[in-house]
Amino acid sequence: MYSLPPDWRLRFMGSEASVAAVNRSAAIREHVGAGKLDLTYIPSNMSTNGQEMISRFLTTLSLYETILQPAELLLVFQTDSMICANSKHNIDEYLGYNWVGAPWDPAGTWGGNGGLSLRSVSHIIDVLRSERRQDDSDPEDVWLSYRLGQQPHGRVANGSVSLTFSGEYNVGLPEHVSNVSNFNDSGNDSNSGSLSVSHPGDFVKGIDDWREGYYEPMGYHIGSGGAHGSIWGTKEKREHIWQYCPEAKMIHKMDMAEFVPGNCGQEW
């Protein structure tokens, strides 16, 4: 939550057991008391036990027409996802899209994994009012994002945009630090010794050099395929992710800390 815009109000939905577990955190209770976070239960006639049940849940019209109202945006943030506070990107950059998630096809024009995704509630309502997903068919993210991409008024993020949002197994463009130093140490004016950047989010030569040449999405999604080699598969890549996005340690099993970025299976 600390990586999301401060004016966002969030809702956590879960079973009675999961809501109780989350509410044991003092930090969570503080957010609830401040009105930043709302804890609520998944309706008793719905389930998230397994991929098919999740797909049914997330393609149920009443979820969007009633339960999520008055929200216009749904950020799906599953337990194998993480948003990186160090990223130069932020969630506000993607608010104009009806769907954005880690792309299945970097050159594609629609679609992205739903495990870490941002979705338009009103556009999903339009889809579900006109069509119903058949049980045991395509996963909800494939089913919904395809139909959102077919809407004449829809705007689904393409592969290149989606790669800046979330990294799963496809790799986006590397970061570049300008060769021009932004540190003014001339001593000739009142700005001596100050840092200046051309645009918010610009990297500073001499400070951000460690980010040169690395892919740094806003967040990461592990997914059912595990930690893919294209993102995590070398010791160098893992060391950089640990420095760039230490929050990512929270989506790995704790015993991985000994090996990432350690020497066990350095490449895969």
Per-segment meaning from a language model:
Residues 81-111:
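Conserved donor-nucleotide/metal-binding helix-loop-beta segment in metal-dependent transferases, i.e.
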Residues 13-72, 86:
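Active-site-proximal specificity loops/subdomain of glycosyltransferases
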Residues 2-5, 66-70, 91-95, 119:
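Short, conserved loop/helix-junction motifs that constitute active-site signature segments
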Residues 1-8, 28-30:
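Short, acidic, metal-binding catalytic loop of nucleotide-sugar glycosyltransferases
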Residues 9-15, 99-102:
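Short, hydrophobic beta-strand segments that form beta-sheet elements in well-ordered domains
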Residues 79-80, 120:
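Generic structural signal for small/hydrophobic residues in well-ordered secondary structure
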Residues 109-268:
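Catalytic core and acceptor-binding pocket of nucleotide-sugar-dependent glycosyltransferases
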